[in-house]
Amino acid sequence: MATTRKIDDCLSTRDGQLWIEECDSVALVERFGSPLFVLSENQIRRNVRRYQQSFQQGWPHGPVKVLPAAKANWISAVQRILADEGCGCDIYSPGELSVALSAGFDRELISVNGVPKDEDHIARCVREGVRITIDSIEELPVIERAASEQGRTARVRLRLKPALPGFTRHSHFVAEGLVPTDIAALAYKGGLSFDQVVALGRRILDNGKVELVGFHQHHGRHHPSTRYWVEQMKSFAAEVGRVCTALGGFQPREIDIGGGFAIRRDPFNAATDYSEPLQLGALFATARGLELLGARRRYRSISRPVSY
């Protein structure tokens, strides 16, 4: 009689051999060779739905979209699965933009981040109608020029530099020494200062070719505790509130809470571990009704590569 031991949702052992879903790993290696990376479509879909459900429960004030980072997995079949599940796509390079477009993602849910973005890349982003996150003050004139030349409206978000005053636990993102997270967040993550965001925001609001849809902040994977995310959300919410006040009561439609999780690879964490801090930190008056974008949910929401 066969002895079966379930490891998790997609892995099990049968008579001492590893099975992935209903596939014998030994048979797979015999067919395709080794090393072999195997991805479970069912597990990818389960992961995406766990995140989507958990974040939606934590944010009842408007729609929530999960935007996995394209750089985590460029395989077109995986990207098509994510698009089919209603995800967006967080991208940086022209190549990643091509992957996202070919996979069939909703263009309004394709988010272009990072510096530097060259003129050709920005022009293509405007032409395709994807969201552009402005990471530096030099990008806005290029976006304005591309929008004017194409007769289109470019939709943008402004990236605020993270600030975590007083969070002195050492950053897990920095390998060289015990660097406090509040310092690491400023040193290792890009973005615009408060004054720069306000100045760019005023310029955009006076410009008919560019539409400001919201704000972005990349939080990184500095610390595994949920307290880190509580403090990040509180700080981000307060900063967005200050910016909106300085812009005369501007109401953002989208808030992009991009970031990675400093987590162990196994076993799977509960998605609620990371969605619950949103309820504590991101509820403020200007945020009601906006769209929450959870960007860069990489490992758990995209794939579980298995090699044996």
Spell out what each predicted region is.
Residues R221-Y308:
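C-terminal active-site-proximal or functional interface alpha/beta core segments in diverse enzymes
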Residues L160-V213, Q217, T226-A238:
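Active-site/ligand-binding-proximal alpha/beta "capping" segment
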Residues G86-G88, G104, G114, A184, ...:
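Glycine-centered flexibility sites
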Residues G33-F37, R107-E108, R127-R131, H170-G191, ...:
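Glycine-rich tight-turn/loop motif centered on a GG-T
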Residues Q43, A69-I75, P94-G95, V115-K117, ...:
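Active-site beta-loop-alpha junctions enriched in small/polar residues
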